[in-house]
């Protein structure tokens, strides 16, 4: 801002040339020093002005003036009607200083000082008219979209165009006008910026930036409350807004959060927030955006819920290439869910308007405008730089307040470069030689940069850098001020930005390769020191600096940290990108133990997002963990050997390759015994116990699961991340409940399942709760408790739908549909079981397929589709033979016997073994023999496994058949032997039925 302009904010007018503040038409009296404080704050609007800076600027030669700013601020607030706790104009920033926060409108005065006339002002913050000539239609369209948003119809607008076409100027002018009434209009404006080089790897970068800025502003506590209530997974990504204790709690509870949940949460926040205020959300430079941000844009755009939301995204069409934004934008635009506002060059009339505004006293605009329009094709950036160049060459000059063109427009032609690039390069060459190194180093630091970063690149004092940058800002040459940063080590540094990314790119191209490498490395090292323990927050940025600085080992290290950040946000594609880039960096390093260790860390981590994006059966998952295992054996690091083995174990276990999974589990256990860390043994016992359970080795499974549970210390392991995201305690208790039921301890099984549910609820950990609910629903299914099965399955499905857990949703669907068939519902439930099975397999899961096929077959039998049921059972046995999955084998043989009778014995009721009312024809001998063979096979398998509950159920089926054959003694002997073993669970359906049959048999024998 120049020193003699008139500035308006709200109803006030600050007349700088006449040193006067007016409220409406009335002057507002202020002491000279108080006016000077207001002037300084307005001149530095939007950035933090420290108390020390104010004292230096307003009281430069006065001792003991440290308390003077406070008095002036109090007087200003009284004069402006402002409140410290709810500021509209002047915000107190902690103990540091003040910030002027009201939107400003500048009235251009014709009498400007000569030096200010020579150089264009900061076009990022300048008044709308000079930079927005010719954009009235586009501006009006944005305002129409805002009006529709204010009435509850969400709007999404993509502002597109080539570099320099004026996207940012248009949007900034619109936002300034939209917020001109201040927040009393009920409009909140959030801004986020995508960053070149590392922005594509930072999940939700512009969204988190916008939310963080909005929630951190005074008076915006509403948003923080809504984040706590509706979007804890987002709040966990904004550590500056919460205490360390709250952050730790959030991170623990949010392990395993899914992308679907994050999208749902932000949708909930937008819905709740926009019932209170209207929200304008700007995301700039989406051509550098990440996958997750694009997913969010799609989700927000496609939602049909009312919301007072206007989302504006800017991007360069020419820079899209194969960026994923291209198909996303095409999809939304083709369905009319978003609108595009493409910017072309401005017209010759608009060029003339610009000249008349910029040079208020002149007579050349009509002659010069067509020529400038032809030269620049209406590109605003080219136009402004060309005019700057004409002023610098004094072809446009001022005398006695009048601007004149010293040559005819045609005489300028030979001096105009062929494009804006050449023109900017001419301007760069005119920069004083002593200032050029500062701009070169700044360009390596980024489009926006901290003075401290440039100081580290040049090994200079930051004060000197700030002086040089401020000199360029005053001249409005390439740079503008952006505010003040405070780094974690307490470093306070001014932040600057290039007026346009093109300037930064051209200055960066001037830097020789060797110097560029040194600059990147020094900047990375300085930021690394300053961030200390919080260095992970800028991992993606550091990865770029060290990569460009040829420090490949450190670059790979920060790619790993950036991948971990991405995984915390469930951004699996970004995590894969970081990890693959890290592995590529390591290929440039010699084969050393350190390199091997780094690759091992990356490969172990890579398996997680690969599984999430490609499924359990993906060969890429196996390759990652196999390579990790090879590397871990080279470095002989026990913990990492176990991690790699567990990764492979999960891969083969979920695929149903149980013999391989068993071997891996045994190796895990063997390795874990060599390490003092109990969590390794806990995981190894759990993995082996789970595997043995499905192999039908129930006693051994129980032993391992109990040992795993004995090692589990909730206090110690609550923050421990194991091979998956299920809490270790829940992961032990739930399968242990199954093992106990199979072994004939139904009461103990129910108790352990209840403990798993209680622990999952206590942890408030959704994935663990989904695990516990699914296992509990299946346990009720084992127990023939249809109502409880349905209730638990419906709870599972609700949680899985809300959180985005496809595995639990598929299993819940199968179990609920089975229960509904058992309770008398129709054939549509059979289709739902099939759909659940298809969804289950689509994830890449095979484990448990035999059990689900058995449930489907049983439901077919219940609905009278016996032949279909028998075909499904044949499929289940084929799967069991291939995988070794034997947990449900006895039940499959029993069901085969029941369905055989149902098919071949008229009137047979498989659920009771009784005949339908009416005549009871004798059963064919061959049918009886076939059914007996299946029942006896079921009993034999159950006895081999010591699966008393499966044995009891098979014995009930066979004894009912023998009752029909009048083999009462044999039936009684068989069933009483099995029933007599049980010591608990006598109120469960199977044991109650067995007791009823035994009483019937006894009565028959004594009759």
Predicted regions and their residues:
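Conserved Walker-type P-loop NTP-binding/catalytic site
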Residues: 183-185, 190, 204-280, 330-333, ...
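DNA-binding patch around the recognition helix
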Residues: 2-8, 41-47, 63-110
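Conserved adenine-nucleotide phosphate-binding loops and their immediately adjacent elements
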Residues: 111-144, 241-253, 353, 413-421
């Amino acid at each position: 801002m120049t020193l003699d302009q008139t500035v308006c904010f709200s109803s006030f007018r600050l007349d700088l040339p006449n040193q006067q503040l007016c409220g409406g038409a009335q002057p507002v009296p202020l002491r000279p020093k108080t006016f000077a404080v207001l002037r300084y704050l307005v001149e530095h609007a939007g950035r933090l002005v420290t108390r020390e800076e104010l004292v230096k600027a307003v009281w430069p030669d006065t001792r003991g003036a440290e308390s003077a700013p406070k008095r002036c601020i109090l007087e200003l607030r009284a004069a402006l009607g402002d409140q410290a706790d709810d500021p509209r104009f002047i915000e107190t920033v902690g103990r540091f200083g003040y910030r002027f926060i009201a939107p400003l409108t500048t009235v251009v005065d014709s009498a400007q000082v000569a030096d200010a006339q020579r150089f264009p002002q900061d076009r990022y913050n300048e008044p709308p008219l000079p930079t927005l000539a010719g954009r009235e239609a586009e501006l009006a369209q944005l305002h129409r979209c805002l009006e529709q948003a204010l009435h509850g119809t969400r709007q999404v607008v993509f502002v597109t165009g080539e570099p320099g076409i004026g996207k940012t100027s248009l949007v900034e002018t619109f936002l300034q006008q939209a917020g001109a009434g201040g927040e009393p209009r009920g409009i909140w404006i959030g801004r986020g910026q995508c960053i070149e080089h590392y922005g594509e790897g930072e999940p939700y970068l512009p969204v988190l930036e916008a939310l963080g800025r909005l929630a951190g502003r005074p008076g915006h506590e509403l948003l923080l409350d809504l984040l706590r209530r509706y979007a804890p997974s987002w709040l966990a990504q904004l550590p500056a807004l919460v205490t360390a204790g709250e952050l730790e709690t959030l991170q623990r509870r949010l392990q395993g959060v899914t992308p679907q949940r994050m999208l749902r949460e932000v949708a909930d926040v937008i819905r709740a927030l926009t019932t209170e205020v209207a929200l304008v959300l700007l995301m700039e430079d989406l051509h550098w955006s990440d996958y997750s941000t694009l997913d969010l844009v799609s989700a927000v755009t496609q939602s049909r819920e009312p919301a007072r939301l206007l989302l504006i995204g800017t991007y360069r069409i020419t820079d899209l290439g194969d960026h994923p934004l291209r198909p996303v934008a095409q999809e939304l635009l083709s369905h009319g869910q978003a609108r595009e506002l493409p910017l072309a060059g401005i017209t010759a009339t608009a060029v003339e308007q610009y000249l008349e505004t910029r040079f208020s006293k002149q007579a050349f605009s009509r002659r010069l405008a067509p020529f400038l329009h032809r030269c620049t094709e209406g590109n605003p950036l080219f136009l402004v730089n060309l005019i700057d160049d004409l002023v610098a060459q004094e072809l446009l000059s001022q005398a006695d307040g009048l601007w004149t063109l010293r040559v005819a427009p045609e005489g300028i032609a030979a001096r105009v470069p062929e494009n804006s690039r050449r023109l900017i390069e001419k301007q760069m060459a005119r920069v004083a030689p002593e200032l050029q190194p500062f701009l070169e180093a700044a360009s390596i630091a980024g489009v926006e940069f901290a003075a401290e970063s440039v100081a580290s690149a040049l090994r200079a004092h930051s004060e000197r850098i700030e002086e040089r940058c401020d000199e360029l800002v005053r001249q409005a040459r390439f740079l503008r001020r952006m505010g003040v940063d405070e780094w974690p080590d307490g470093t306070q540094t001014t932040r600057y930005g290039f007026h346009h990314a093109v300037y930064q790119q051209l200055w960066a191209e001037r830097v020789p390769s060797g110097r560029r490498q040194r600059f990147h490395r020094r900047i990375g090292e300085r930021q690394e020191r300053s961030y200390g323990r919080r260095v992970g927050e800028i991992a993606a940025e550091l990865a770029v600096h060290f990569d460009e600085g040829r420090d490949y080992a450190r670059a790979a290290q920060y790619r790993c940290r950036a991948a971990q950040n991405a995984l915390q946000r469930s951004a699996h594609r970004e995590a894969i990108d970081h990890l693959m880039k890290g592995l590529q960096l390591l290929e440039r390093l010699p084969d050393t133990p350190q390199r091997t260790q780094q690759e091992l860390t990356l490969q172990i981590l890579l398996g997680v997002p690969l599984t999430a994006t490609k499924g359990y059966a993906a060969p890429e998952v196996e390759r990652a963990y196999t390579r990790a295992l090879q590397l871990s054996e080279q470095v002989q690091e026990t913990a990492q050997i176990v991690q790699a083995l567990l990764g492979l174990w999960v891969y083969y276990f979920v695929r149903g390759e149980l013999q391989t999974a068993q071997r891996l589990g045994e190796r895990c256990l063997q390795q874990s015994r060599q390490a003092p860390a109990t969590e390794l043994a806990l995981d190894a016992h759990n993995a082996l116990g789970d595997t043995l359970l499905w192999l039908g080795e129930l006693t051994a499974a129980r032993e391992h699961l109990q040992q795993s549970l004995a090692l589990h210390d909730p206090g110690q392991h609550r923050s421990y991340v194991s091979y998956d995201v299920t809490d270790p305690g829940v992961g032990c208790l739930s399968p242990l409940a199954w093992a106990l039921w199979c072994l004939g301890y139904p009461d103990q099984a129910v108790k352990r399942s209840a403990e798993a549910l209680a622990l999952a609820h206590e942890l408030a950990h959704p994935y663990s709760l989904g695990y516990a609910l699914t296992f509990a629903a299946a346990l009720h299914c084992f127990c023939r408790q249809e109502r409880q099965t349905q209730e638990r399955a419906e709870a599972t499905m609700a949680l899985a739908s809300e959180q985005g857990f496809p595995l639990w949703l598929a299993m819940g669907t199968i179990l609920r549909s089975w229960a509904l068939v058992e309770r008398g519902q129709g054939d549509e439930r059979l289709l739902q079981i099939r759909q659940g099975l298809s969804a289950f397999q689509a994830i890449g899961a095979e484990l448990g397929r035999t059990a689900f096929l058995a449930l489907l077959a049983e439901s077919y039998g219940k609905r009278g589709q016996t032949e279909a049921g028998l075909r499904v059972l044949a499929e289940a046995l084929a799967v069991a033979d291939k995988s070794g999955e034997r947990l449900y084998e006895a039940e499959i043989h029993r069901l085969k016997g029941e369905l055989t009778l149902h098919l071949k014995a008229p009137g047979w009721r498989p659920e009771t073994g009784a005949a339908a009312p009416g005549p009871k024809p004798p059963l064919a001998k061959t049918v009886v023999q076939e059914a007996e063979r299946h029942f006896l096979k079921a009993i034999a398998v159950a006895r081999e496994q010591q699966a008393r509950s499966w044995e009891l159920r098979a014995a009930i089926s066979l004894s009912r058949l023998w009752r029909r054959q009048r083999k009462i003694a044999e039936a009684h002997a068989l069933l009483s032997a099995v029933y007599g073993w049980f010591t608990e669970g006598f109120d469960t359906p199977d044991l109650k039925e067995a007791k009823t049959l035994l009483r019937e048999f006894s009565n028959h024998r004594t009759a």
